[in-house]
Regions:
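Hydrophobic ligand-binding cavity/cleft-lining segments
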Residues: 2-61
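Extracytoplasmic/periplasmic/luminal assembly and interaction segments
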Residues: 39, 49-95, 102
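Beta-strand/loop substructures that line and gate deep hydrophobic ligand-binding cavities in soluble
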Residues: 80-139, 143-145
Length: 145
């Protein structure tokens, strides 16, 4: 009986410690990448969902992307994959023939420890395809007439 009691108390204490450590992980995570692009038609390429297959590696058949708003300098989208919805926005600033494109995803997490600990790998999971996509976008825009 003592071993069962010790095991039960150990599981409770371990769970509380894991929960308290998870409180140190933020509940809002932003994954962001940016690139400088020479060209004036960056806004139109990003705002055109039909051109995304030419440059965006994250845009595929399993992800549903909804365009929420397209304004000068800002394209707001909502990405849905299975049951997860994530805002993914493009901010575009033009200056002296160069456009700075910032692409970011905002993850809002619940208090669950497994969600918070899982968010630690988001940058490694989303960052490289975002960088490759932005480089593809740069090649597409700079090589277009």
């Amino acid at each position: 009986m003592r071993i069962v009691k010790l095991g039960f108390i150990s599981i409770i204490v371990f769970s509380v410690i894991i929960f308290l450590i998870s409180l140190l992980v933020p509940s809002h995570v932003r994954i962001s990448r940016a690139i400088d692009i020479r060209g004036d038609n960056v806004d139109t390429v990003i705002a055109n969902p039909h051109s995304w297959k030419d440059w965006n590696e994250l845009y595929n058949d399993s992800a549903l992307v909804t365009f929420l708003s397209v304004k000068p300098g800002m394209v707001e989208t909502m990405w849905r994959y299975k049951h997860i919805q994530v805002p993914g926005n493009f901010r575009i600033e033009h200056s002296a023939g160069i456009s700075v494109v910032q692409w970011y995803f905002d993850f809002h997490l619940k208090w669950y420890p497994w969600e918070k600990f899982g968010s630690i790998i988001f940058d490694k999971e989303f960052g490289p395809p975002m960088e490759r996509s932005l480089n593809n976008l740069k090649k597409l825009v700079e090589n277009s007439p």
